[in-house]
Amino acid sequence: MISSLYAGRRVQYPVMEHYTWDDMEKEVLSETIARKIISGEKAMVAQVFLAKGAIVPEHFHESEQITYILEGALEFVLEGQTIVVGKGQVLRIPSYVPHKAVALEDTLDLDIFAPIRHDWLKKDDAYLRGGK
C-alpha cells in the first residue's frame, strides 16, 4: 500500500501493477473465441481473439463496454440496429443494452469494461463458451 495526502487527509491505495500482454494466459473459450484478461478493482480490459465466423450470442451485462478493433471487423447488432466496426474503430455499448456480434474476418479487439465482469473472472459465461 502507498499512502499519500489528498484533500487534507491521508489516503491509502494499492501499488500500481504493470503487465505485458505476451505474459498473460490466453483462455480458449471455444474453437473460434479466446481471450486474455487484465482486471483491476473497478475496470478490466481484455484482448479478445475471434476467428472469422465466430458468433458472440446476444447477451447484456451491467458493465459499460468499449470495444476497440485492433485487427479485423465485427458486425454488431444492438437494439435491432446493425453496425460494422472495423480496424481502428471504437464502439461504446451502454450498460444493460442487449448486443451480439459476428466476426466478419479474423479479429483482435480490446474490450474495456467498467465495472468489471465478474462472470468472466469466475468463468460463468456459458454464452461465450458454447459460441460457434
Model-derived features: positions:
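A short, N-terminal "cap"/entry segment at the start of jelly-roll beta-barrel domains
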Residues: 2-42, 46, 125-132
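Ligand-binding loop in jelly-roll beta-barrel domains
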Residues: 95-119
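Short strand-coil-strand connectors
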Residues: 41, 77-81, 104
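A cytosolic small-molecule/anion-sensing beta-strand core signal
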Residues: 70-71, 86-87, 105
